């Protein structure tokens, strides 16, 4: 991989995973059997792709870097089960694109650069019915937020929205020396297993997202200060009444609320006339 003359592009947040032990463990987490389908986001130079291609009945890899696409296509030219797509994962209609290559469920493997991790995560969240598992490598800071529980400093919007629909577990801590070039921070591999049903009933998911995002908009402010002002379609006095009916102290902060409490708050606000 280092002898191909292709340097990592800082603008794309590229750090190529070279540690074979970690690559093998990630492939084992993906755990695709014969006939199963894998979407790989950002295959880079194809290190993980090689492991995944040994498992999958169909592997679709989406790569943005136009320097790497010919390298990948050349490496896997003899494997009809591997398709390399040149493009930005954020520009693709996942449902339409994957539909060309087979029916769900798909498994996902990705090494997500920090600068695009959040938008890609939301794309995967919104297309969750296509997937049976996600194995994602992220900067440790982002990974910790996704797996965090109430009361921790990492707990936030990502924690709540993903844990509504997935079991999220931290699986592999990846040190900087496992990459080339060497990054300055640790990474973590997370496993996301979709739930058959949302963990709790939230009433209206679009409105639920609004409530959660508003609750974390000013982390040092109380829920009352975050939610008042009418942006959620409920007058200021109505917000106070809803919090009281839900048994949630208005002086608490968003990071202390459990998923169930966010669901109760959302349904209470909807009942009080809340709207998008």
Curated annotation (Swiss-Prot):
Transmembrane segments: none
Single GO cellular component term: cytosol
Pfam families in alphabetical order: RrnaAD
Enzyme class: transferase
EC identifiers of the protein: 2.1.1.182
Keywords, ordered alphabetically: Cytoplasm, Methyltransferase, RNA-binding, rRNA processing, S-adenosyl-L-methionine, Transferase
Binding positions for S-adenosyl-L-methionine per the UniProt entry: 15, 17, 42, 63, 88, 111
The organism's taxonomic lineage, starting at the top: Bacteria, Pseudomonadati, Thermodesulfobacteriota, Desulfuromonadia, Geobacterales
Reactions catalysed: adenosine(1518)/adenosine(1519) in 16S rRNA + 4 S-adenosyl-L-methionine = N(6)-dimethyladenosine(1518)/N(6)-dimethyladenosine(1519) in 16S rRNA + 4 S-adenosyl-L-homocysteine + 4 H(+)
Molecular function per GO: 16S rRNA (adenine(1518)-N(6)/adenine(1519)-N(6))-dimethyltransferase activity; RNA binding; rRNA (adenine-N6,N6-)-dimethyltransferase activity
Name by which UniProt lists this protein: Ribosomal RNA small subunit methyltransferase A
An annotated GO BP: rRNA methylation
Underlying gene: rsmA
Localization: Cytoplasm
């Amino acid at each position: 991989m280092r002898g191909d003359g292709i340097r990592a592009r800082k603008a794309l947040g590229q750090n190529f995973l070279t540690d074979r032990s970690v690559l093998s463990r990630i492939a084992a987490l993906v755990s695709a059997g014969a006939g199963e389908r894998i979407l790989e986001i950002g295959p880079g130079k194809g290190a993980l792709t090689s492991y995944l291609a040994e498992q999958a009945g169909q592997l679709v890899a989406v790569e943005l870097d136009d320097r790497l696409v010919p390298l990948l296509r050349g490496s896997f030219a003899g494997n009809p089960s591997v398709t390399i797509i040149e493009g930005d994962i954020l520009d693709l209609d996942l449902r339409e694109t994957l539909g060309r290559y087979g029916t769900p469920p798909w498994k996902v493997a990705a090494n997500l650069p920090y600068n695009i991790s959040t938008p890609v995560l939301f794309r995967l969240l919104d297309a969750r019915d296509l997937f049976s598992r996600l194995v994602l490598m992220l900067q440790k800071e982002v990974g910790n937020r996704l797996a965090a529980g109430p009361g921790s400093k990492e707990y936030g919007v990502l924690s709540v929205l993903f844990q509504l629909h997935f079991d999220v577990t931290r699986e592999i801590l990846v040190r900087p020396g496992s990459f080339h070039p060497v990054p300055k921070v640790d990474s973590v591999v997370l496993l996301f297993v979709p739930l058959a049903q949302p963990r709790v009933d939230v009433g209206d998911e679009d409105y639920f997202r609004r409530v959660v995002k508003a609750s974390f908009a000013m982390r040092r402010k109380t829920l009352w200060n975050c939610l008042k002002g009418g942006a959620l379609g409920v007058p200021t006095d109505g917000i106070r009444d809803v919090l009281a009916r839900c048994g949630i102290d208005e002086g608490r902060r968003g990071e202390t609320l459990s998923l169930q409490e966010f669901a109760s708050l959302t349904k209470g606000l909807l009942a009080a006339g809340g709207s998008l």
